[in-house]
Amino acid sequence: MSVKSVSIKKWWLPVVLALLVVASGALAGSLYWTQYRPDTQTDAAAERTVIDAASAGAVALLSYSPDTLDKDFSAAKSHLTGDFLTYYSQFSQQIVAPAAKQRGVKTTASVVQSAVSELRPESAVVLLFIDQETRSTERPQPTLAASSVRVSMAKSGGNWLISKFDPI
């Protein structure tokens, strides 16, 4: 064995060990930022906050009275974001408002059960089970309806807002 091959072997081992230490550190850092850190932002308190926001938004969306439509629609819009806000603005003015005024439709919704399906630091999906009572001038006796809704939530400016509202 020559002197040259012995010096290369002595030099190579510390370099490989140093690279393994750096790679292990990079892997640990990556796992912290992608796995552990998001988990700390989605604890039980975050789950309760997103359920409360989804429930309040759903009740605001599904509860209105012909006497207070503008106030009711404004309250509902404060819980919405993105394309769903645009859709709801058009739908509420073009479909709901004329029908509510013409027929005197009044609806009241309440959330009876809820569960978080997905929770990430900036988005969530909540399942809501809703009871809705509807009255109108044509039907003064309340009509009760039960429904379930998949509510997609997005965090915007520190607040959870509804980005999708899909009946199941």
Report residues per predicted region.
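Short, low-complexity Ser/Thr-rich regulatory SLiMs
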Residues: 20, 118, 153-155
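Amphipathic, hydrophobic N-terminal targeting peptides for secretion and organelle import
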Residues: 1-42
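Surface-exposed, charged secondary-structure patches
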Residues: 101-135
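Short beta-strand edge/turn micro-motifs at domain boundaries
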Residues: 146-168
